[in-house]
Every structure is written in structure tokens, then in C-alpha cells.
């Protein structure tokens, strides 16, 4: 799908369709008023007859409006004018895209980007429209024998901006939006891939392909079990013992900083390509969704793709911690004591608390990069889902400025997060009679104690932890990976690169 921006009046648009907003109660937006004037009151007469109230998401498709050059006009309800916020704006764009795609409008000029959204500029409105459009049209049908396609799908969207001086901002927004959307799609595709295809080896192949696609900027190294053993990554190795698939850690390095020796930002993604729970076997119901336990790694992959596509002036390392947690004769057991790469020992009380065992060794491994900061992303705890539901990613950090940066990026991107505490008072829940710590801390504050466990391996750098257990995928009829938090982390990196779109 193609996107572009232009600045022009609606009466001069010769297009398959013009998209304009209508507010409650039956109030035309300024652009709709211009079209109404051209058509001698045709549109306002329809509204007076009750054809459209203006509630968020309502649509009315008009054909051959008098004196209008375009074939059709799509009126889209935007709710109350003063209440149009980020969430409603994205809902309106989503409804617009679906309607255009379903009604055979192969190209359209969209004036929704001229609407006033509280606290948001043209760059934000155009970028969010691009990202939302790509999200709306996303399908995962690679493994279906019969693919359903729209007869006349939407192919081209032109976003109108109020003035010519905003064209540059709009073009930059499209560039950024397309790169972020591609990163989100890559993460969703990996997440949706079945575990008989997407194992640690598949993740490694995708990481290598990324290096091939962006040769000169991206390099990939894959570390196998033998090298992990030599490094002392015994906790990581233990988790994969029950699987016939080898555990593989894919290290993707992107160097975009003019100073190649600049300290990198490190992103670590939990990549449990299937989590049966090991000996502490999960219930059978819903176990199929444990293919999504690698969505942390998938999101890191998507962010690395975005950074390479935009050639961000940063040095970034992305680690995909690929592994599979299965029961079997070689599987690790409750009661085992593991010596981690850091030298600290862990008593395994539950083999289904495996993500932290993989991550703790990776968080020790990345010390060698002397990172400016480290962010890990993991579908880590059901407790985070109970605390924050499926709307907010859990954020914990040992560095307040880093936490603030991430929360700000989350709000900018519309990929929201909520900070949870990381207090020392929670650490005692991890006490063990037989090792330095246990791998679980009981039910109270489970998301926090999981992060407290990881914090014991991150004392040498500024670190944040994103628990995406509630936000990485949807269940039910809309089942599928969400691609979160690619948008948040992409915004974080754009901000770091000074490319945040502020005017």
C-alpha cells in the first residue's frame, strides 16, 4: 500500500474517494463544510435527515455528490469535537481503512489528518494513520491453502495537511510510520508462526537474514549450546534440556553511530518458542498460545529491523534468546540448583518460571558490550496480566531517568506502559535455604518478584524490564500477536536519535 502527503483544498481533489470527518451531533468538520458549500448544502441536508449522527466510527458513503470532482465522499463519525483524543483518532482511522478496503475504493484522499487531536501535531497524526492503516490491513495467511483477498483492495492513501510547510513533516512521518509498521509486522509474523516451524533455529535464520538484508550496517552471530556451556550459561541451558531443538542465542549488532565505539543500547528478548512448562507442566487448555512466549524476542527483532531501515544514528545490540521448555527424560527438575553465568546459584522451585532463568544469563552476557543501557522484553508473568490486564505493559527499572524515557515514549507511541515498583522489600521472597535465591517468590507481587530476580543480574548497568505477558497477543476470535512493544521501543530509539517529530 502506498502513502503520500499533499496540501490542497477538497474541491480540487479528483480521486476515487475523499474522507472527511463529522462530529456529534451532526456537525460538519471544517473540510466537510467546504464540500457542503460546493455541493449547495447536499451533505448538511443528509445529516438533517438523520443519515449520520457523528458518533465515533459511524460511516456514510456518498456517491456522485453534486459539483464534487471525486467519485465518492466518505463521511466518518469522530465523536464530540472537543473530546477527540489519540485513542478515538486511531479508531476513526481504523474504521476508515476497513470501509475503504471493503467498498472497493482503491485510492483515497484523507483529510482526517487535519482534525484537531488534543496535544498532537501533524507528524503524529500522519504517522499514526500510517501505522494504524498497516495494522488494520494485516493478515497472517501464509499457512492457509485458500487465501481470501478483497476484490478491489485499498492501494493508495493520500493524507492532506493544512499547509505546504507541513509537507516535510508529513513525509518524515510516513517514512517513520512505514518503518515502524514493518517492524510490527515482522514481530507479529514471528509470533504467529507455529512452534513446529518457529524454533530457536528459525529465529536464528531470521536474524541472519536481517544481516543479509542490511549488509554493512547489521551483523549477526549465533551462539549454540556448546559455546553457552563454555560461557557458563547453565541456567539458560537447563531450560532447553528437555527439548530436541537446540537452544540458540542470536546476537544482532547494528552500528549506525558515526562513532563506532559509542556505547550501545542493548535490547534483550525472551524467545521461548514454545513453553509447555517443563516438568511443572501447564494445563492443557490454552497451551497452544504458549507459542507466543517468544514475543519478546520477536519484538526485539522488529525494532532492530526498524532501526536498520531508518539508519538511526545509534549503536544497538539486539539479543534473541531462543529456547524451548519441554518435559522429558533430560528436562530440568524442581529442586535442581543451577549455577548461572554470573556465579550466583538458583534453586528451581518451578520449571515453568523459566524465562527468568534464560534472561539472567543473557543479562550477564551483555555486560561485555559495556552498554549505555539495557532493556529486556519478556512475556514473563501471569501476575502482570492480573495487575494490568491486556492494555498496559508492565515496566520496572533500576534507573528512574530510563523508566521516565520509556514511559514518555509509550505515551507518544500510543503503546502504553505502567511502572511497577522494584523495592528491596520484595527481594526476601526469593530467599532459598539451599542456594543464593529461588526462581519464584510466591504469589504476592509475582510480576515484581520476577523483576527483582532479574535485577540481581543487572547491577553493572542501567536497566529496564518490560513484562508484555498481557499485551503481546490477543486470545479468542481476534487471536494473534499484537507486535507490542515495537512501537514503544521504536519511539524510544527515535527520541534517543533526536528524530521524535516535534515541531
From Swiss-Prot:
PROSITE patterns: CYTOSOL_AP. It is an enzyme of class 3 (hydrolase). The keyword Metal-binding applies. Binds 2 manganese ions per subunit. The keyword ATP-binding does not apply. Its EC number is 3.4.11.1, 3.4.11.10. The active site is at 282, 356. Mn(2+) 1 binds at residues 275, 352, 354. One of its GO terms (molecular function) is manganese ion binding. Keywords: Aminopeptidase, Cytoplasm, Hydrolase, Manganese, Metal-binding, Protease. Its main location: cytoplasm. CDD domains: Peptidase_M17 (cd00433). InterPro entries: Leucine_aapep/pepB (IPR011356), Macro_dom-like (IPR043472), Peptidase_M17_C (IPR000819), Peptidase_M17_leu_NH2_pept (IPR023042), Peptidase_M17_N (IPR008283). PANTHER family: CYTOSOL AMINOPEPTIDASE (PTHR11963:SF23), LEUCINE AMINOPEPTIDASE-RELATED (PTHR11963). Belongs to the peptidase M17 family. This is Probable cytosol aminopeptidase. It comes from Edwardsiella ictaluri (strain 93-146). The lineage of its organism: Bacteria, Pseudomonadati, Pseudomonadota, Gammaproteobacteria, Enterobacterales.
